């Protein structure tokens, strides 16, 4: 049907310019030993930086975000996996965080993460934090997307910045850094 559109909202940090050079796992790994925790923390929490905290929480006392809770994920993650997740978030999407695309019988398209499903409705959490409840009887099409709503940072962060964010995240496991701004 020509009236339906398929799109996916991917959040892009506002303050980061697109880089000419692509950051790769290979370019980041040698820099991890010199990753700066303070710079990584600033990038993680800053709205003008990577802004990871907009979607991810690092402490179970913080309210849940749009993205996976990093306080539990980091317990089993190695630095290479963290770097890969930053540069290519679609490589491995945590269960429950794949975007859903739902087309309703009025031709409207809705995207979000499925946060609740009953016999009669679906509830999608959208990137802006709003929840949309859709009656199942109105759903024409529902597709689980193979894309992450998280932007790829391969052209948004330099290898050194990725190393800094990774150093900050890895430090949370050992308690070396504060989990809060």
What does each of the following model-derived ranges do?
Residues 4-7, 12-14, 87, 108-110, ...:
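C-terminal capping alpha-helices of c-type cytochrome domains
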Residues 17-19, 56, 141-143:
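Flexible hinge/switch segments at interdomain interfaces of large molecular machines
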Residues 16-47, 66, 77-81, 105-108, ...:
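Electrostatic cytochrome c docking/interface patches
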